[in-house]
A protein has these predicted regions:
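A residue-level detector for the "anchor" residue at the start of short, highly conserved motifs
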Residues: 1-164
Length: 164
């Protein structure tokens, strides 16, 4: 979402499930996928107010993130979040800083429209640090992850990637 200065300071609301984000002159990132348990709202600059089910209201300041689970209606606020990690996609890269392979592969799966299967469940929690350009082909990314020793091997079958 662009800064409000680009829109003459006009405030607006973003509705997501039972969450309402009131934009009060700001730039923020909302990560809300249907198949994810949690919704993440990260403030880059300005200020936002998040209302949950018209009951609880949370004000967010820059470098803060709200993690909300709509199933349990639990909410937590994280301070001093590395905002670049959350918005790097806007700059054509995925920035994986200490993320578990399971989470990384979920992002890769969405971007390249493939199903990812882990044959060895132990590697799902293996942490990876790296930056991957979004315009790279999937084969190059898989080769790099293999060369870093994160996975032993992989196999591609049409729209499925099997990690070994």
């Amino acid at each position: 979402v662009s800064p409000s200065s680009d829109n003459e300071g006009a405030k607006f609301q973003v509705h997501n499930q039972s969450q309402v984000i009131e934009v009060l002159g700001t730039e923020f990132n909302l990560k809300a996928y249907n198949n994810d348990d949690n919704v993440f709202t990260t403030l880059v600059e300005g200020k936002i107010a998040i209302n949950l089910n018209n009951s609880e209201k949370v004000d967010l300041l820059p470098d803060q993130q709200v993690e909300w689970n709509p199933n349990t209606n639990t909410l937590s606020v994280k301070k001093d979040v590395n905002v670049y990690n959350e918005i790097s996609w806007k700059y054509g890269v995925f920035n994986f800083n200490g993320k578990p392979l399971k989470e990384i592969m979920k992002t890769i799966s969405r971007w390249y429209d493939v199903e990812i299967i882990f044959l060895d469940k132990k590697i799902e929690e293996t942490e990876f640090v790296g930056v991957i350009r979004k315009n790279r082909n999937l084969e190059d990314i898989l080769i790099n992850i293999k060369n870093f020793g994160v996975i032993k091997d992989y196999e591609r079958k049409e729209k499925t990637v099997i990690l070994k």
